[in-house]
């Protein structure tokens, strides 16, 4: 995972285990479940009650950017004319390509 500290100050505690990101022992996201055919951007904020929410809130805590799903093409038999047929196969989710941007908890 690529981690960017957006500004100066203390950041939220986080842990990563396989494809799961846990923030402050309060919110867990299995990031592989959010992978799509297009780039995905997830905002994590504190709401007015000091609870973590996904989406916009009172104050940014983190942003997660997941790149679009990638594919390979593998030969899968031949057609009736003897030409090779190819199957579109998704590449396994790669946490090393996910970007986590952390915002200061102060301010």
Regions found by a protein language model. Name each.
Residues 1-107:
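Cysteine-centric segments in proteins
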């Amino acid at each position: 995972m690529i981690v960017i500290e957006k500004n100066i100050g203390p950041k939220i505690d986080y842990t990563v285990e396989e494809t799961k990101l846990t923030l402050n022992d309060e919110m867990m996201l299995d990031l592989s479940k959010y992978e799509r055919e297009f780039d995905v951007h997830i905002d994590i904020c504190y709401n007015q009650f000091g609870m973590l929410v996904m989406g916009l809130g009172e104050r940014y805590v983190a942003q997660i950017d997941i790149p679009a799903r990638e594919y390979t093409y593998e030969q899968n038999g031949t057609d009736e004319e003897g030409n090779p047929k190819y199957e579109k196969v998704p590449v396994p989710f790669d946490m090393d390509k996910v970007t986590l941007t952390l915002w200061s908890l102060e301010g």
